[in-house]
């Protein structure tokens, strides 16, 4: 008895392959974090191994991205070693019609925002379930917080109408700790009518390092979809 392929995985694989095909030889590539981006990193490594690509350099946004890139033979550099990033490819937890994003399900949004903002072209790879009419519809806003400021930041976001919850680890006791050594609050808002304003307001709270709202950064959204049971990719630009 054969198991039917997972439709979500099929969509992610299709969009990962499409994104990896956008990378050209000699490019400096921002390597995002997450399940879809992990597949894209694998596709990049396969293109390198086949000789379809040469002399690319990756800028990882997390420990996970770094490990995967090394596993698939992608040379890595830091921001100190490059003058620019040609393109960044990253996932998202939500995408609204204006191409604003919520990111940070992998607790890597601080580094992701740095790398994605520096890229000449920021490509977002998602499956169709991540498209929403308004940010905050299905996913809370991740907020990275200095550990000593956790309590006052929770009070501040509550005054803004948010419902903060400390993200706890899986397969470990205690909270999730970011690559920077900080904690993450997942903040649920009833509505986010102005993502740009909320992004600024959250970042102005003392003790907040960065939040997962990304405004005016994404240039292209590649959406994995199923049509008649077959995976396809739709571009929003």
Curated annotation (Swiss-Prot):
One of its GO terms (molecular function) is ribose-5-phosphate isomerase activity. It catalyses: aldehydo-D-ribose 5-phosphate = D-ribulose 5-phosphate. GO terms for cellular component: cytosol. Its EC number is 5.3.1.6. Keywords: Isomerase. It comes from the Bacteria. The active site is at residue 112. SUPFAM superfamilies: D-ribose-5-phosphate isomerase (RpiA), lid domain, NagB/RpiA/CoA transferase-like. Homodimer. Belongs to the ribose 5-phosphate isomerase family. This is Ribose-5-phosphate isomerase A. It comes from Cyanothece sp. (strain PCC 7425 / ATCC 29141).
